[in-house]
Amino acid sequence: MLKLPDRGTLGISAALWILIGASSLVQAAALVKIDGSSTVFPITEAVAEDFQKAMRGAVNVTVGISGTGGGFKKFCRGQTDIVNASRPILKKEMDECKAAGVQYVEMPVAFDALTVVVNPKNDWSKTITVEELKKMWEPAAQGKVTRWNQINPSWPDEAFKLYGPGSDSGTFDYFTEAIVGKAKSSRGDFTASEDDNVLVQGVASDKNGLGFFGFAYYIENQKKLKAVAVDGGKGPVLPSVKTVEDGSYQPLSRPIFIYVNIKSADRPEVKEFVEFYMKNAITLVKEVKFFSLPAQVYTTNMDHLNRKKVGTVFDGRPEVGLRIEEVLKREASQ
C-alpha cells in the first residue's frame, strides 16, 4: 500500500525545494555591478553587451553612470565590483577605500582625447589657446567674462554659453587641472550634466555654445558639432588617432581606466567579465571611437589581477600631459 508522507515530511520537503529553487535563482542571476564615468561608459557597455551574449544570460552586467567621483564613492563603499574612471584614483578616494577595506587592481583600458566643441554655425573660433580656455572657464570669469570678444577681440560681441560635466566627473577634474591649473577650479555659471548626451544637445542647439567631453561623444555627433583645435603652446592641434598616439594633442589627451575590487574578482562572473574585457578591448575600444592601448597593456592588466597586484601607479591627483608610453612604463613596473 502506498504510504503518503506526513505533514512534517511535507514541510521539510517543501523547505528543501524552496532552498534549491532559491539557489538556482541566485546562480541564474549572477550579477556584475559597475558604475562611474560617463566617458568610459561606452567602452564598458560595449564589453558588457558582448559578454552577456557570450554567457547566454547566465550573467547580468549593470553599467551605471554617476561620474568618476560618484563611481568611486560607491566602489569604496563596496556597492559595486568595478568602477569606470576617466582619471586615476584620488588620494581621498584611496583613503576611503582603505578605511573600508576595499583593495583594487588599476587597469588602463584606453586613451581619450578630451574634445572642445562648438556649434557648426560658429565660424570664428576654429582654434583656441589654453590661455583663452582658461580665461573662459576660470572661477574669476564667473559673471564677468560672458562674451566672445572678451576672450579674443576678433570674435563677435555676443554672449557665449558654456556646457560641461558636473563636479563629480573625472573629465571635469582633468579639464580644470589641465586648463585652469587646479582640479575642480571653475566658474559655476555653466550648464552642467553627468550625461554627455545632454551636453551634446546643448551645444548642438545653441549657436553660441561651447562645451567639452570625451572624443567618442564628439565622433558620434560630429554632424551637429564642430571640434576646435587646441593650441597648447606649439600650434593648434585637432584630436585624432595620430595626434593622440604621437602625443601632440596636449594637454587634453589622457588615459582612462577601470578599477576592479580584488574581493569581487574572486567571484567567477567578475573574473570572467574582466578576462573578456581585456581579451576584447582592442577591438571594442576602437569600435566605440576611443584609442586602444598596445596589446601588452591588457595582458599586463590580467597579470596584475591574477597576481593580486593591488594599488595605483599614480600619486593621488590628476596628472596632465601623460603620453601612452609613460602610462605603459608605469604599469609595467608596478
Residue map of PLM features:
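N-terminal secretory signal peptides that target proteins for export/translocation
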Residues: 1-9
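Short, flexible coil/linker elements and helix-boundary hinge sites characteristic
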Residues: 3, 21-24, 309
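Bacterial N-terminal signal peptides
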Residues: 11-24
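Flexible loop/hinge segments at secondary-structure junctions
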Residues: 28-334
